């Protein structure tokens, strides 16, 4: 009788532990960024520190023998984007600094 009681409690404890682990793993992925420091984990799956947005890779099919363009060494989000005057009449353009 004592053995059945022990195994029953052990099975219940194991089920509760597995449910708790499942719950924590699902809610952890939905936490905001500042909670990552609290949990001690970094979720930087899609972060590429040395790549620019929207630029082709250094090797391309149309330029054999060349190493491609040299990318910016410092990332500047809108550093080289200059737009002309807007045709809609709502402004929207900025002129490049001399």
UniProtKB/Swiss-Prot annotation:
Keywords: Apoplast, Cell membrane, Cleavage on pair of basic residues, Membrane, Repeat, Secreted, Signal
GO cellular component: apoplast; plasma membrane
Localisation per UniProt entry: Cell membrane; Secreted, Extracellular space, Apoplast
Main location: membrane
GO molecular function: LRR domain binding; receptor serine/threonine kinase binding
Motif segment (SCOOP motif 1): 52-66
Disulphide bonds in the chain: none
Organism domain of life: Eukaryota
Keyword Signal on entry: yes
Range of residues in the leader sequence: 1-29
Comp. bias (Polar residues): 52-61
Chain positions covered by the region annotation Disordered: 50-98
Tissues with expression: Mostly expressed in leaves and seedlings shoots, to a lower extent, in roots, but barely in flowers.
Record motif SxS motif essential for MIK2 binding, residues: 58-60, 86-88
Record motif SCOOP motif 2, residues: 80-94
Homology family: Belongs to the serine rich endogenous peptide (SCOOP) phytocytokine family.
Job description of the protein: Brassicaceae-specific phytocytokine (plant endogenous peptide released into the apoplast) perceived by MIK2 in a BAK1/SERK3 and SERK4 coreceptors-dependent manner, that modulates various physiological and antimicrobial processes including growth prevention and reactive oxygen species (ROS) response regulation. Inhibits root growth and regulates root meristems. Promotes ROS production and MAPK (e.g. MPK3, MPK4 and MPK6) activation in a MIK2-dependent manner, thus leading to the up-regulation of immune-related marker genes (e.g. WRKY30, WRKY33 and CYP81F2).
Assembly and interaction partners: Interacts with MIK2 (via extracellular leucine-rich repeat domain); this interaction triggers the formation of complex between MIK2 and the BAK1/SERK3 and SERK4 coreceptors, and subsequent BAK1 activation by phosphorylation.
Protein name, per record: Serine rich endogenous peptide 10
């Amino acid at each position: 009788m004592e053995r059945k009681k022990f195994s029953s409690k052990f099975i219940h404890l194991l089920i509760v532990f597995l449910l708790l682990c499942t719950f924590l793993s699902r809610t952890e992925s939905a936490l905001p960024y500042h909670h990552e420091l609290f949990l001690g984990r970094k979720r930087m799956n899609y972060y590429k520190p040395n790549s620019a947005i929207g630029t082709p890779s250094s090797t391309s099919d149309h330029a054999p023998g060349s190493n491609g363009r040299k990318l910016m060494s410092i990332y500047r989000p809108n550093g080289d984007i200059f737009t002309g005057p807007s045709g809609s009449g709502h402004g929207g353009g900025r002129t490049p600094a001399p």
